[in-house]
């Protein structure tokens, strides 16, 4: 049996940044995943075990730190730009297509949470992808209206301050009260502050982003692109107990796509544990079977 390895890799983006992360080569020429994380999430958070799972089954996976986070380039730090992340997915495909373990005709966009929507946008614009798999796509960007207004006002003040040469303003993702300071509802806020600190520390996640990250999130309108995903094959995996992105809205998203497509309802699973644990492996298996049918390997 081949020894499974993990390679430290880096590649350049079209605008000149270097993104760094991990490659899990299958050891044989074949399919590959461009894996995309959720909002400000690190490569260490949740998906490394998923990459190993696919690697053991003959699928190469690429998992990198989002630009401006972790080991990847970009200033200011933790300045999240979802549109740029879509572009980075395209450059990841270009990088993977040159790797000896990857058949460039068998590269799949794979995303989780907000990364699932980013992956769908990438697939809508890049027909090099053989398929796209979206797990728990974030369809609901629910902000408290009062905090939303305050966040946008703060973002405008930050623009003036930055033009004057000052450093960027940062907001935490989860505050000491367990809430998102910008008013964005996040499933993680059900954890205690102590649990959240442990989560951020163990996953190498900075519990802050620039105020302009929230400005970009509030202006982001990805769903107009969704009809353009077709005819690329698409799979949506929806947790039945998702309290961050309503399952019925994920189903409505799925209904936009044309065949070939597949919808999987992950019973008794939530947004953050959809594909983890022993009972989560069955949904990874369904993804693998979908890939085998669509890519014919």
UniProtKB/Swiss-Prot annotation:
EC assignment: 2.3.-.-
Database matches in InterPro entries: AB_hydrolase_fold, Hydrolase_4, Polyketide_trans_af380
Database matches in SUPFAM superfamilies: alpha/beta-Hydrolases
Keywords carried by this UniProt record: Transferase
Enzyme class: transferase
Region called Abhydrolase domain, residue ranges: 49-272
Protein's pathway: Mycotoxin biosynthesis
Functional note: Polyketide transferase; part of the core atranone cluster (CAC) which products are predicted to catalyze most or all steps of atranone synthesis, starting from geranylgeranyl pyrophosphate (GGPP). The initial cyclization of GGPP to dolabellane is probably performed by the terpene cyclase ATR13. The Baeyer-Villiger oxidation near the end of the atranone synthesis, which converts atranones D and E to atranones F and G is predicted to be catalyzed by the monooxygenase ATR8. Of the CAC's other predicted gene products, the reducing PKS ATR6 might synthesize a polyketide chain.
Stated family: Belongs to the polyketide transferase af380 family.
Protein known as: Polyketide transferase ATR5
The encoding gene: ATR5
């Amino acid at each position: 049996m081949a020894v499974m390895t993990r390679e430290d890799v880096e590649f350049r983006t079209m605008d000149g940044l270097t993104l760094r992360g991990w490659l899990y080569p299958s050891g044989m020429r074949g399919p590959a995943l461009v894996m995309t994380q959720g909002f400000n999430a690190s490569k260490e958070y949740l998906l490394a075990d998923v990459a190993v799972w696919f690697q053991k089954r003959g699928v190469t996976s690429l998992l990198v730190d989002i630009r401006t986070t972790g080991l990847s380039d970009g200033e200011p730090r933790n300045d999240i730009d979802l549109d740029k992340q879509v572009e980075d997915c395209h450059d990841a495909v270009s990088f993977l297509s040159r790797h000896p373990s990857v058949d460039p005709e068998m590269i799949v966009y794979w995303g989780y949470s907000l990364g699932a929507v980013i992956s769908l946008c990438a697939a809508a614009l890049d027909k090099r992808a053989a398929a796209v798999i979206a797990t728990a796509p974030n369809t609901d960007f629910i902000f408290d209206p009062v905090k939303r207004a305050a966040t946008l006002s703060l973002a405008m003040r930050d623009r003036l301050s930055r033009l004057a040469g000052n450093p960027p303003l940062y907001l935490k993702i989860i505050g000491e009260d367990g809430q998102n300071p910008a008013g964005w509802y996040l499933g993680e806020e059900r954890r205690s502050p102590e649990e959240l600190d442990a989560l951020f520390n163990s996953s190498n996640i900075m519990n802050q982003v620039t105020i302009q990250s929230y400005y970009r999130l509030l202006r982001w309108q990805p769903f107009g692109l969704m009809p353009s995903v077709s005819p690329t094959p698409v799979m949506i995996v929806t947790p039945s107990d998702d309290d961050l992105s309503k399952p019925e809205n994920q189903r409505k998203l799925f209904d936009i796509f044309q065949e070939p497509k597949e919808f999987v309802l992950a019973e008794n699973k939530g947004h953050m544990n959809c594909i983890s644990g022993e009972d989560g492996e069955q949904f990874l298996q369904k993804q693998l079977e979908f890939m085998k049918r669509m890519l014919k390997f």
